[in-house]
Amino acid sequence: MKLQKLIIENIASIEKACIDFEHGPLGEDSIFLICGPTGAGKSTLLDAVCLALYNTTPRLKQAANERYLDENDSFSGTGEVSIDASRMLMRRDSVSAQVELWFTDAAGDALRAVWSVARARNKAGGKIQKVVWTLSLQDGTPLTNKSTETRTEIERRIGLTFEQFCRTTLLAQGEFTKFLK
């Protein structure tokens, strides 16, 4: 798998960003370092890649049993939202969030994974809607329509589950000691 382009809108601390892995400085080298001060958005970049590919992130998995009260939540029926719900990465006071990842799979097919979520009626106080997560060819031809299909198809095309991807591709914050063991 090779990343080509990452487009982020309203994910955690990032309002808008487009990272081109094929042109400019990132296109010239096969390896690069993500660095910056605390809070600069380094982990958010990795979260965005994981959201597009797997509809979850390492830091959400770490908070699997934590919940908070959100009177605008429409899914649980209790107003409680799990901290591990991927839609919780929507930037505060935004009405929608999206990640678009352009990449080539193990077979060399050019693909585009899109993860998005929005609030009802495009209002900041609107209820958070269901995540929409799709996979298509880069020419726009859809390959999946449902989240379960998207997960299965991405895992098949990349050849890695979320856990395998995390172990082989990135090291989440707080996981370095575990990695050394």
Language model features with spans:
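Cytochrome P450
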Residues: 179-181
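Extreme N-terminal "head/tail" segments of very large remodeling/mechanoenzyme assemblies
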Residues: 1-170, 174-177
